[in-house]
Amino acid sequence: MRHYEIVFIVHPDQSEQVPAMIERYKQLVTSQNGQIHRVEDWGRRQMAYMIQKLAKAHYVCLNIECGKDTLAELEHAFKFNDAVLRHLIVQTKKAETAPSPMMKEVQREEARKAAQTTTEGQPA
């Protein structure tokens, strides 16, 4: 089995359905003896260019290990899901388990926002 990194972009109106979509794709991989090495929900982000007159979308990254039949089934699921605006599948040499640079940025932003809310709540 080979290792793949998959990034897909979901319509912003469908953001609340993203956890269910991730679970469905994870189940599809594991049901066919595949492995999930990393799942990252990058959240709603600004896109580099407009897609279907949208400036923002919900980003998700998966690192999986599966066979080509499973990969074809995943790709088919992406193509026929109207909520998925774009998807990219890249073959990698090994399993990636460490947080991606994008996820580290998301974590930094969340930490900064948390620090701001705690300093705003304290009296001067």
Swiss-Prot record:
Q: Which Gene Ontology terms cover its molecular function?
A: small ribosomal subunit rRNA binding; structural constituent of ribosome
- GO cellular component labels: cytosolic small ribosomal subunit
Q: Some GO term, biological process aspect, for this entry: which one?
A: translation
Entry's transmembrane regions: none
Instruction: Give the CDD domains listed for this entry.
Output: bS6
Keyword Ribonucleoprotein included in the entry's annotation: yes
UniProt xrefs under Pfam families: Ribosomal_S6
Protein keywords = Ribonucleoprotein, Ribosomal protein, RNA-binding, rRNA-binding
Please list where the region (Disordered) is annotated.
Answer: 96-124
Compositional bias, Polar residues, is annotated for: 115-124
Q: Which PANTHER family match?
A: MITOCHONDRIAL 28S RIBOSOMAL PROTEIN S6, SMALL RIBOSOMAL SUBUNIT PROTEIN BS6M
Which NCBIfam families does the record match to this protein?
A: S6 (TIGR00166)
Give the matching HAMAP family. Answer: Ribosomal_bS6
Family membership noted in the UniProt record: Belongs to the bacterial ribosomal protein bS6 family.
Tell me the function of this protein.
Answer: Binds together with bS18 to 16S ribosomal RNA.
Write the protein's name. Small ribosomal subunit protein bS6
Source species of the chain? Cupriavidus metallidurans (strain ATCC 43123 / DSM 2839 / NBRC 102507 / CH34) (Ralstonia metallidurans)
Name the gene: rpsF
